[in-house]
A protein has these predicted regions:
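Conserved acetyl-CoA-binding loop-helix of GNAT-fold acetyltransferases
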Residues: 92, 98-111, 140
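C-terminal "cap" of GNAT-fold acetyltransferases
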Residues: 148-167
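Conserved acyl-donor/pantetheine-binding loop and adjacent beta-alpha core of acyl/acetyltransferases
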Residues: 61-89
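Glycine-rich phosphate/pyrophosphate-binding loop shared by adenosine-nucleotide-utilizing enzymes
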Residues: 5, 55-59, 85
Length: 167
């Protein structure tokens, strides 16, 4: 039987699971405790979870321009685009690999951006150390590199990516 997969707005009771999922993927994203999650959620245009048979299996946080987000990657896109949707993080529980949950979230995100008249989606992923699964995933959605920058006192380099939203 096919699992019941749904995307919905994150609820307060999802916070614990979201923080645990983020902690498990922290080498590819940035640390986030419950307080930081709440701060990000207040700035988010998309604060979604994806569920499998009712259980949270992943999440996505994305911010629009002028969200007031103090982040060097977000600032990079703010300097280049007047209207955009920035993916701060997308995390899927490894035990749900193969269900295409990330693909479902991004398909919904592109539809959402289109409905809001947003012309471009932006994000970044690590290239030092490399995050090859993220690179391959974003390539499939038409993202291309528009810059790179060093973070964490030179310990990490990210590829800053943008993809057009078909209007």
């Amino acid at each position: 039987m096919m699992p019941d997969i749904r995307i919905r707005d994150a609820a307060a009771e999802d916070a614990g699971v979201i923080v645990l999922l983020n902690d498990a993927a922290v080498q590819h994203t940035s640390a986030m405790n419950a307080m930081r999650l709440q701060e990000l959620q207040t700035m988010a245009n998309c604060n979604w979870v994806i569920t499998v048979d009712g259980a949270v299996a992943g999440f996505l946080l994305a911010m629009r321009e002028r969200a007031g987000y103090a982040n060097p990657n977000y600032d990079f896109f703010t300097a280049r685009y007047t209207v955009f949707l920035y993916v701060d993080r997308i995390v899927i529980a490894p035990e749900h690999a193969g269900l295409k949950l990330g693909t479902r979230l991004y398909e919904a995100l592109f539809e959402h951006a289109h409905a809001q008249g947003v012309p471009v989606l932006t994000c970044e992923y690590n290239i030092e150390p490399p995050n090859e699964p993220s690179r391959r995933f974003h390539d499939r959605f038409g993202f291309s590199e528009i810059g790179t920058q060093l973070l964490d006192s030179g310990k990490k380099r990210v590829s800053l990516q943008a993809a057009p939203v078909r209007q």
